[in-house]
């Protein structure tokens, strides 16, 4: 697909017509292609667009759609495939489609298509062109207009309503263009009578007809011209293009007589219908009043019945809740057992979790240690390899620097020899004739020039030696740097290079002495000195310009990446020196005519060294040729030098050439300003050198000689002739020097390119270094990922331990939520029943409003009021729905609050458990403290005994010991007595303390028993809460299901109300249009009667013109048929050429793809080679690392032995954990005791359930007794309904009699009919289709209403005459289909009903619950009988469960059915004892 066709196809396929047409695939049986479309969407967008467009343009889908629109038109929906190819059957399908569509417009819709027929050849053989897209768009527009005017238009309108609003608006505009005759697309064949039209309207009609005829004539001319062109292409020798000689108008004038007759007939028919409708209006008003009174009475009765139905539903809900509670008991027991099992598993998981935590901690510590050692070894290896590479690079660069230095010295020697030769030639050329006064000054000038050359050479050698020393210092600094840095690859770390680069611009001062000295001589010596200065300048400049040739002599300089930037300051001096050239070249042409122009370049030249020497010969050439060449010739050369300059701009960090080229444009002005500032600084330096006495002596000599030469007088004619020849020779030499300068400039450019290549190589190396660092970082990240994986595993183990707690918390939260939701359940159901009643009332009211709107024209106001009331009720229902949503949100918030409360309860429970553990720990601590205190008391007693012994010993050695020995023995006895007394006292104190500690221990044991009792109570409470939560969860699920049903019903009601509102708007628009048409017809009748004669005359003229046009049309048609055959052959050749072109394009695409694949493979091959080199280098590194890792492995084995020791210690700790597990088993025994208590409670609940079942049987017997009363009332209601049906039948027969009398004259088209007659037929059909004998007639309660109309809902097509093709479509088939669907549902439900006993008549089953779907039956499906007992099927005095379920179902059916029916006002309400 070409580039221009893609957007056009995309716009067309995203438009409204294509969206509508492709969406009809599901209606015509092509929905199975959806999977293919999804596969196409996954392909490339152009191919997907082509496939979707070709699916539309092949005509198969459109023919199927047209088969639904016009099934009885010409031929069936036949599709021809496999003729000569896809293009041929595409042309055949589209031709067939166009013929059937044109016939449908002309025969069925009485419309003539004015738009030209589509170019079928373009659509068939070039379907992707813009012309084909436009032709297909026109066909789709006509198909859309036919779909909304056919018999099955409701089907297509529903499809259009299912699209987006934007697409609907666009489709509405397209439908308006196609369906309105005045839009220029179609023309009405049966219009009003020209005599009945006003003059203005008649003139407008005639103008539109003339415009249509002229358009048709233009299209005919275009078609004839195209046919002639095709004939010329087919047979260029036989046929010649013939211009259309005449252009008679061609149009549908032969239909004008038919239009006039149709208009008159329509006017008469409208008058007759107006009279009939006026009579019908009076009759229908009386009927409407009676029906309104009846409707009011029925509403009151329905309200009374709805209250009783609500009470019955409440009773039924209570019984269901009791049954569900009884059925949840086994499930609660099973949940309790599962919870206990999960508790045991949780304890086992906890112990395993602790073991895993300890083990993972040890593994993490060892892993961290190993990672640190590995990282240190990697860093050392990296530093070692980097330092080795840097040493090798520095050695190679040092050798290159020595080689460059030798080459530079050799070049300096050559330049000195060339300068001497040039000096000798200059002397010979400047020698005056013998005897002239100029010999003395020339003899004095030669030594000064030689001295200058030697001084320049010496300065150059000094600068080279200084640079050599600086390079050696830089090398030493680089060798002394640590291995972690990369001085060669990272430019910002090259700090030692910066002083060299800063000093580099100052070196050219030595080279500028000689030209500056000559300039100074020129300033002081006058014009004669200027004749001497140019040769000297040329010699010096030539010597300085040939110096840059040295770098080219060594072709191996490009091997080092940063050689030109860091190790060769000469290149850095040469490369940026062209930046100042624009200043010199701009000033030199301005002063080319004067001989003192040398002052401006010398004073303005920037201090950039050899750059000024390169540019000086050009300036000198400008002086010598200034009288002949214009100023404009030098300006391009200057600008060329300026453009070369910024490429070599110097800088301390040596930026790459790519950056300099990017900055070339905006930095030119800055280069000029900086060049001027540097020039001023350089002038100051040169003035300082000029003042040097070593330069002043030869200068004074030359000045004296020049002055003598100037003042001696004019030069003879021979000297002038020789001077002219010498000037020519000098010019030639200057030209040679200029060429040499250009060659040097080229060499500088080559060096610049080499520098760029070196910079790129350095960038590549830096990228490789970055890649290596990234690989290292990835290795670190992998290690971190492994650590994170271990942490994740630990978290997963912890989550497994916390899963039980979270599950229990969620279950408890659901319990609380469902408890809150259960309180609102009844309110929901009450609201739902009320909404259902309101929706049914709204349905009936809408149907009544629709029937009144279609039958009576003057009931528009009353319908509007009814509609407003309905909208108000709908808004109230929406508000109620919003309130229910708010309540639901409130319930959700309460659920969240209950969950929070449950969490708080769990936290309190945990805190109590922690408090219990704390008390145990406290008791143990107190016991330990008591033991320690007892030991301390014993120690104190021992210390006191020792003190007493010491005192006794001191007393024995005191003054008492000095007495007689007789006193020693009594004192010893006394001390022993005192000591015994103290020991007894201390023992008594210890006994008292022991008794106190035993009392505290008993008190703590009592507290422990109370805490255990509270823990048991909390466990019981948690179990009860779990039971309550499960019960509330079931209630919540029931409530959610009911809420969803209510929401769905509310949405259905809103959709129905929207559809009713839309139909009302349509009917109102039709009524207003009919009123306007009636008024317009009355006016047109008065106007057209006056102008009928003139129109008849014009009609005769138009008929004559029409005959002439028909003759011309027949001739053109014959020629068109001849040309069509020739065109088919030409188009077949075009198709073959197009296929060949597409094949060639595919070959070209395939060739380009292969070329791209080849380039990609080459790049991958290069990259693989580079990777192979890197891998070989890394392999050597890894071999070194392997030796280190072996040593580490030995160390790790030692650490492993240590870890095994630690694991032995952990096993001992696990034994302690086993002891704690034994304590947990005791707790499990307590839980088994609780289980036995729970089973006892379950047995009590079973007894209660049996009692409830007995009560339920009693309630069922009462309901059977109340059933007789209900059926007696039902018979009375049926009698009243029969009376109402008889009255309604009389009204229907009266309406039929009126329509038989007032039936209008049938139209000539037999396929159209009156939808009102069809409706009356359907009103009469229920009488013929009676119910079965001996029972209640099915659907009899709605026989006379509009709800009983319509056929089966599967066809969605009209019945009776419409099915045969002889009837007209009814304005409300959708409503009839819905009402018939309701009747069929009721009939099927009544047929599937089962009898309870023979004494109850057959009625309709409940629509709220299907058979086998009640809560009781679901309960019986889960449990075979009450509490496991078998189901009783007997019909004796003991009513079984199944019969009771049927009785309840029938009772629900009658309660729901008797709501909208008629009943007596005196009927008593149901007794409150009714329960289900």
Swiss-Prot record:
Induction or repression: By endoplasmic reticulum stress.
GO cellular component terms attached to this protein's record: centrosome; cytoplasm; cytosol; endoplasmic reticulum; Golgi apparatus; membrane; nucleoplasm
Source organism superkingdom: Eukaryota
GO terms, biological process: cytoplasmic microtubule organization; cytoskeleton-dependent intracellular transport; defense response to protozoan; positive regulation of cytokine production; positive regulation of T cell activation; positive regulation of T cell proliferation
Membrane topology: Peripheral membrane protein
Biased composition range(s): Basic and acidic residues: 678-690, 825-834, 842-866, 1448-1469
Comp. bias (Polar residues): 572-586
A Pfam family recorded for this sequence: HOOK_N
Protein location: Membrane; Cytoplasm, Cytoskeleton, Microtubule organizing center; Endoplasmic reticulum; Golgi apparatus
Family of the protein in this entry: Belongs to the CCDC88 family.
Name of this protein: Coiled-coil domain-containing protein 88B
Annotated source species: Homo sapiens
């Amino acid at each position: 697909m070409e580039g221009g066709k893609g957007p056009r196809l995309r716009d067309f396929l995203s438009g409204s017509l294509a969206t509508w047409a492709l969406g009809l695939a599901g209606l015509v049986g092509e929905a199975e292609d959806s999977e293919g479309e999804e596969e196409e969407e996954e392909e490339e967008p152009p191919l997907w667009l082509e496939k979707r467009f070709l699916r539309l343009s092949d005509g198969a889908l459109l023919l199927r759609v047209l088969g639904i629109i016009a099934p009885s038109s010409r031929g069936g929906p036949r599709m021809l495939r496999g003729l000569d190819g896809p293009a041929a059957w595409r042309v055949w399908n589209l031709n067939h489609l166009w013929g059937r569509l044109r016939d449908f417009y002309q025969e069925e819709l009485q419309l003539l298509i004015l738009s030209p027929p589509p170019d079928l050849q373009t659509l068939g053989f070039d379907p992707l062109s813009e012309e084909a897209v436009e032709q297909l768009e026109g066909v789709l527009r006509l198909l859309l207009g036919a779909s909304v005017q056919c018999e099955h238009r409701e089907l297509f309108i529903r499809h259009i309503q299912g699209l987006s609003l934007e697409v609907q608006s666009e489709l509405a505009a397209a439908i308006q263009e196609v369906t309105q005759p005045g839009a220029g697309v179609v023309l009405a064949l049966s219009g009003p009578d020209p005599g009945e039209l006003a003059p203005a309207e008649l003139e407008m009609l005639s103008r539109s007809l003339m415009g249509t005829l002229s358009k048709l004539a233009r299209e005919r001319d275009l078609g004839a011209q195209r046919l002639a062109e095709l004939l010329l292409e087919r047979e260029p020798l036989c046929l010649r293009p013939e211009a259309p000689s005449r252009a008679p108008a061609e149009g549908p004038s032969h239909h004008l007589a038919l239009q006039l007759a149709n208009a008159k007939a329509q006017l008469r028919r409208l008058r007759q219908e107006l009279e009939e409708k006026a009579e019908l209006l009076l009759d229908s008003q009386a009927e409407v009043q009676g029906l309104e009174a009846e409707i009011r009475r029925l509403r009151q009765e329905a309200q009374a019945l709805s209250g009783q139905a609500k009470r019955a539903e409440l009773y039924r809900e209570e019984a269901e809740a009791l049954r569900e509670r009884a059925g949840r008991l086994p499930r609660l027991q099973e949940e309790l057992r599962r919870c206990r099992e999960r508790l045991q598993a949780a304890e086992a998981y906890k112990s395993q979790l602790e073991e895993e935590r300890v083990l993972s901690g040890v593994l993490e510590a060892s892993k961290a240690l190993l990672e640190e050692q590995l990282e240190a070894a990697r860093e050392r290896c990296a530093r070692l390899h980097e330092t080795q590479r840097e040493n090798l690079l520095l050695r190679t660069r040092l050798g290159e620097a020595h080689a460059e230095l030798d080459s530079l010295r050799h070049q300096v020697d050559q330049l000195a020899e060339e300068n001497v030769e040039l000096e000798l030639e200059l002397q010979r050329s400047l020698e005056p004739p013998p005897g002239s006064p100029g010999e003395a000054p020339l003899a004095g000038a030669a030594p000064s020039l030689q001295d200058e050359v030697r001084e320049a050479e010496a300065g150059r050698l000094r600068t080279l030696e200084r640079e050599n020393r600086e390079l050696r210092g830089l090398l030493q600094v680089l060798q002394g740097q640590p291995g972690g840095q990369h001085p060669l690859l990272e430019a910002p770390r090259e700090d030692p290079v910066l002083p060299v680069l800063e000093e580099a611009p100052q070196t050219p001062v030595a080279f500028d002495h000689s030209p500056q000295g000559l300039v100074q001589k020129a300033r002081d010596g006058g014009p004669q000195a200027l004749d001497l200065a140019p040769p000297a300048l040329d010699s010096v400049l030539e010597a300085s310009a040939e110096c840059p040739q040295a770098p080219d002599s060594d072709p191996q300089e490009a091997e080092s990446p940063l050689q030109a930037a860091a190790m060769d300051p000469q290149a850095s001096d040469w490369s940026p020196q062209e930046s100042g050239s624009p200043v010199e070249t701009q000033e030199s042409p301005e002063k080319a005519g004067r001989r003192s122009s040398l002052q401006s370049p010398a004073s303005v030249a920037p201090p950039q060294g050899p750059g000024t020497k390169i540019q000086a010969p050009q300036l000198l050439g400008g002086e010598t040729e200034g009288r002949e060449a214009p100023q404009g010739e030098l300006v391009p050369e200057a600008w060329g030098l300026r453009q070369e300059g910024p490429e070599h701009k110097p800088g301390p960090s040596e930026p790459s050439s790519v950056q300099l080229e990017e900055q070339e444009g905006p930095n030119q002005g800055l280069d000029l300003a900086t060049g001027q500032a540097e020039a001023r600084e350089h002038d100051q330096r040169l003035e300082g050198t000029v003042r040097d006495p070593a330069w002043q002596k030869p200068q004074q000599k030359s000045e004296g000689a020049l002055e003598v030469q100037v003042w001696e007088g004019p030069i003879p004619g021979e000297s002038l002739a020789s001077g002219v020849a010498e000037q020519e020779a000098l010019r030639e030499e200057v030209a040679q020097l200029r060429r040499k300068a250009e060659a040097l400039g080229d060499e500088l450019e080559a060096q610049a390119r080499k520098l760029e290549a070196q910079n790129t190589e350095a960038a590549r190396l830096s990228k490789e270094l970055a890649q290596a660092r990234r690989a290292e970082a990835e290795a670190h990240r992998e290690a971190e990922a492994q650590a994170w994986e271990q942490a994740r595993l630990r978290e997963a183990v912890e989550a497994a331990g916390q899963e039980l707690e979270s599950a229990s918390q969620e279950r408890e939260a659901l319990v609380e939520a469902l408890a809150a939701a259960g309180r609102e359940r009844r309110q929901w159901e009450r609201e739902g029943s009320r909404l259902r009643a309101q929706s049914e009332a709204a349905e009936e009211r809408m149907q009544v409003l629709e029937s009144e709107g279609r039958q009576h024209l003057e009931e528009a106001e009353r319908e509007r009021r009814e509609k407003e009331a309905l909208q108000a009720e709908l808004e109230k229902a929406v508000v109620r729905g919003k309130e229910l949503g708010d309540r639901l949100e409130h319930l959700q918030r309460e659920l969240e609050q209950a969950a929070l409360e449950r969490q708080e309860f769990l936290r309190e429970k945990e805190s109590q458990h922690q408090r219990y553990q704390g008390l145990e720990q406290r008791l143990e601590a107190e016991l330990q403290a008591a033991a320690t205190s007892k030991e301390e008391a014993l120690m104190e007693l021992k210390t006191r005994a020792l003190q007493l012994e010491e005192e006794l010993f001191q007393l024995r050695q005191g003054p008492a010991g000095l007495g007689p020995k007789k006193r020693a023995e009594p004192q010893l006895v006394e001390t022993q007595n005192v000591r015994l007394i103290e020991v007894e006292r201390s023992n008594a104190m210890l006994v008292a303390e022991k008794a106190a500690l035993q009392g505290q221990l008993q008190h703590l044991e009592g507290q422990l028993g109370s805490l255990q009792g509270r823990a048991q109570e909390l466990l019981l409470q948690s179990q009860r809460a779990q039971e309550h939560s499960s019960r509330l969860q079931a209630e919540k699920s029931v409530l959610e299901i009911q809420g969803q049903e209510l929401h769905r019903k509310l949405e259905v009601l809103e959709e129905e109300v929207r559809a009713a509102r839309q139909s009302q708007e349509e009917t109102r628009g039709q009524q207003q249009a009919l009123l306007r048409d009636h008024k317009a017809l009355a006016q047109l009748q008065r106007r057209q009667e006056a102008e009928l004669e003139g129109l008849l005359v014009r009609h005769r003229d138009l008929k004559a013109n029409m005959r002439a046009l028909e003759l011309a049309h027949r001739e053109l048609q014959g020629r068109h048929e001849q040309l069509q055959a020739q065109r088919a052959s030409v188009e077949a050749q075009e198709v073959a050429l197009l296929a060949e072109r597409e094949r060639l394009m595919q070959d070209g695409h395939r060739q380009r793809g292969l070329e791209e694949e080849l380039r990609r493979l080459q790049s991958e091959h290069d990259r693989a080679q580079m990777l192979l080199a890197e891998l070989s280098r890394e392999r050597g590194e890894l071999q070194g690392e392997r030796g280190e890792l072996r040593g580490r492995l030995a160390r790790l084995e030692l650490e492993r032995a240590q870890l095994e020791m630690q694991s032995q210690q952990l096993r001992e700790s696990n034994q302690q954990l086993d002891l704690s597990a034994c304590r947990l088993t005791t707790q499990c025994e307590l839980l088994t005791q609780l289980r036995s208590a729970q089973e006892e409670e379950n047995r009590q609940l079973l007894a209660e359930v049996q009692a409830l079942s007995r009560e339920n049987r009693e309630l069922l017997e009462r309901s059977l007794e109340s059933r007789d009363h209900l059926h007696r009332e039902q018979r009375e209601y049926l009698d009243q309904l029969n009376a109402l049906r008889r009255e309604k039948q009389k009204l229907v027969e009266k309406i039929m009699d009126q329509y038989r009398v007032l039936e209008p004259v049938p139209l000539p088209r037999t396929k159209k009919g009156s939808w009102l007659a069809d409706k009356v037929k359907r009103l009469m059909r229920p009488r013929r289709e009676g119910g079965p004998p001996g029972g209640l007639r099915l659907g009899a309660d709605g026989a006379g209403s509009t709800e009983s109309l319509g056929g089966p809902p599967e066809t969605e097509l009209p019945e009776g005459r419409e099915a045969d093709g002889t009837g007209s479509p009814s304005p409300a088939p959708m409503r009839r289909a819905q009402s018939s669907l309701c009747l069929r549902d009721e009939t099927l439900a009544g047929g599937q009903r089962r009898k309870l006993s023979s004494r109850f008549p057959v009625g309709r089953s409940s629509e709220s619950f299907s058979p086998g779907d009640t809560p009781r039956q679901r309960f019986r499906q889960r449990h075979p009988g009450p509490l496991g007992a078998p189901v009783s099927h007997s019909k004796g005095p003991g009513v079984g469960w199944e019969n009771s379920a049927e009785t309840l179902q029938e009772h629900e059916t009658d309660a729901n059915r008797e709501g909208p029916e008629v009943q007596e006002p005196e009927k008593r309400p149901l007794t409150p004892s009714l329960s289900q």
